């Protein structure tokens, strides 16, 4: 009995230490990325500025599990969210994983897998990812994201430039200032409706996991969020977040994500 009591006490102390390391201010500050429409990654803001979407729901579940008040901190792109996690301005975020980001933040498991492709205007005859890569084609992507880094790596002939947000990218397509927009496939159907004659290309130039992230040098915090995401994938919480956001056709990431 004494041994069991000692073990339980030690486990309680370890949990308390993990929570303190993860959320030193006493509240869980979560960086989310907003856009005009929801995706498996982006949230939308209501009239009061409150975020809604997959990552907002998962963040809420994490705060509930840790018994912490929740503070959402919203950014227009994942590059700024990465900066906030790295600097300690926020405690946790969710973002696509690539080698560049792994140098800056620590990733737990992916909750979902996605792929990146292009949305092209009507005047561009390209039907596939490969056909976008032609001299004279103007491609745009969101600054400091895994998607634009992958597009830069794979494009050999087309030109590519960055914008600060999805809204700015759509405006450039409408104004004829760009021919193609690089983004996650699940995000694009809504924006195709906003740009007459536009379409989504076949194929993908990137397949990637979207994962929970914390600052480097916080092993207890990383272990805590890893356990949470693994449990959320097993108990249906991630599935529910996807379904509630309108992504019933998107699969939950397997327990051994390809990006980890």
Model-derived regions: residue spans:
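Short loop->beta-strand "edge-of-pocket" segments that line small-molecule binding or catalytic clefts
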Residues: 26-34, 52, 130-147, 159
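Periplasmic-binding protein-like
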Residues: 112-122, 185, 189-230, 248-260
């Amino acid at each position: 009995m004494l041994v069991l009591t000692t073990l339980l006490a030690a486990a309680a102390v370890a949990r308390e230490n993990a929570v303190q390391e993860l959320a030193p201010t006493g509240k869980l500050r979560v960086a989310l990325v907003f856009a005009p429409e929801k995706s498996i990654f982006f949230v939308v803001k209501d009239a009061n500025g409150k975020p809604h979407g997959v990552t907002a729901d998962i963040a809420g579940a994490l705060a509930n599990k840790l018994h912490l008040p929740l503070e959402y901190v919203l950014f227009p792109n994942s590059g700024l969210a990465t900066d906030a996690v790295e600097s300690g301005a926020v405690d946790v975020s969710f973002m696509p994983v690539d080698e560049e980001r792994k140098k800056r933040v620590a990733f737990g498991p992916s909750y979902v897998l996605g792929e990146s492709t292009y949305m092209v205007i009507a005047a561009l005859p390209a039907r596939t990812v490969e056909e976008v890569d032609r001299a004279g084609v103007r491609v745009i992507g969101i600054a400091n994201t895994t998607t634009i880094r992958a597009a830069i790596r794979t494009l050999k002939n087309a030109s590519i430039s960055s914008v600060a947000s999805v809204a700015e990218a759509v405006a450039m397509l409408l104004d004829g200032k760009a021919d193609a927009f690089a983004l996650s496939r699940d995000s694009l159907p809504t924006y195709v409706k906003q740009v007459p004659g536009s379409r989504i290309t076949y194929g993908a130039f990137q397949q990637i996991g979207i994962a929970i992230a914390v600052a480097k040098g916080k092993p207890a915090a990383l272990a805590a969020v890893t356990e949470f995401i693994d449990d959320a994938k097993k108990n249906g919480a991630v599935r529910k977040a996807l379904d509630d956001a309108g992504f019933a056709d998107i699969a939950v990431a397997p327990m051994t994500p390809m990006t980890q």
